[in-house]
Amino acid sequence: MQLTHLNKQNNPTMVDVSDKHITTREAYASGVISMSEQAFESAINHTGKKGPITQTAIIAAIMGSKKTSEIIPMCHPLMINKINVDITPNPAEHSITLGVLVKCEGKTGVEMEALTGVSIGLLTIYDMLKAIDKSMVISDIALQSKSGGKSGDFVREDS
C-alpha cells in the first residue's frame, strides 16, 4: 500500500480530494491525564490559580480541533459542523478522560481534528495544573470511532 501523502518522487504532497464525494463524516477520540490527588481535586473543584480548568480545557479542545489544518501539515481545512467535548473525572485513579466528537459534511475525514482536540484539551489541563503536579501523565490518546467516507466505519474494539 502506498502512502497517500507521498508523490511518485517520494516527496510530501497534500492529497487531492477533488473527485471524492461529500458525505457526513464523524470521529470520536479520547485520552487520559493522570495526576496527583491534590491536582485532581483542584481540577474538579475549580480551585486552580489559572481559573476553571475543565471549562478551559473544553474551549481549548474546540479551538484545537478547529485549527488542525494549521498545525498538521497535510490536513485539509474543513468546514466543521459540530464539536462536542466531554470530560469524565475518574476519582479512584485521580485522572480525567477527555473525549472529542467532530462532525462535518465533506470530502475528507475528521479523525485528525478529533485527535488534535483531545491532545490540546489534555495539554491545557497539564498547563493549568503544572504548578501543583509536574509529574502528570497524558496517555491513551486514540481514535475510538469514525464514520463516513470511502474507508467506511471504524470502532475501536477495546472501547
Swiss-Prot record:
Top EC class of this enzyme: lyase
Give the positions the UniProt entry annotates as the active site.
D127
Q: Which domain of life is it from?
A: Bacteria
The protein's matches in InterPro entries, at most eight in alphabetical order, are given as: MoaC, MoaC_bact/euk, MoaC_sf, Mopterin_CF_biosynth-C_dom
Which pathway does the database say it acts in? Cofactor biosynthesis; molybdopterin biosynthesis
Q: Which residues form a coiled coil?
A: none
User: Could you cite one Gene Ontology molecular function of this protein?
Assistant: cyclic pyranopterin monophosphate synthase activity
The answer to whether keyword Lyase applies is yes
Q: Which UniProt keywords apply?
A: Lyase, Molybdenum cofactor biosynthesis
Kindly state which reaction or reactions the protein catalyses.
(8S)-3',8-cyclo-7,8-dihydroguanosine 5'-triphosphate = cyclic pyranopterin phosphate + diphosphate
Q: Which SUPFAM superfamilies match?
A: Molybdenum cofactor biosynthesis protein C, MoaC
Query: What family, per the record?
Result: Belongs to the MoaC family.
Q: What does this protein do?
A: Catalyzes the conversion of (8S)-3',8-cyclo-7,8-dihydroguanosine 5'-triphosphate to cyclic pyranopterin monophosphate (cPMP).
Subunit annotation: Homohexamer; trimer of dimers.
Q: What protein name does the entry list?
A: Cyclic pyranopterin monophosphate synthase
Q: Which organism is it from?
A: Helicobacter hepaticus (strain ATCC 51449 / 3B1)
> Corresponding gene?
moaC
